[in-house]
């Protein structure tokens, strides 16, 4: 059972998420979120002292609502680096359509809105963390070709929202085609030829 404080935080996060999904992140103010959550601005600031903290919490809440930890469990529990890579690409590739609207909005104001930039940077760091775990697993399996840092950079770039957007939204690829080719390209880029 949630405490009163937890219920208020949840209401705030739901309000922030709704406003971000239905508006422009750069124009969503703390006062707007407080009003939507039916609390005072002062009460909002007790929970989130600044807009950046609130936007970061909101994007993490979006992950929680979508059950990202449960979705990633097969990747995290995979026995091999290749299994981990395949599971992670499946999860992230299929997750992007769910968060596309809000992430695209954050990216659009990235250069002019520090709070939105902080929220997007936080999510990119989470993806990079997953990519680093994959490259570590591939290295432990003796399959990693480039240096681990370079491999993490490559995989993070391959799995970027911008690449997904280009292929699925601009080029019209289906999700299954995107997943198939990103897995193939990732393996070609990361794994030694002897692993083929």
Predicted regions and their residues:
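Amphipathic alpha-helical packing segments from all-alpha helical-bundle domains
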Residues: 93-107, 114-141, 149-153, 186-191
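Helix-turn-helix
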Residues: 11, 19-53, 57
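Hydrophobic/aromatic-rich alpha-helical bundle segments in the mid-to-C-terminal region
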Residues: 138-185, 193-196
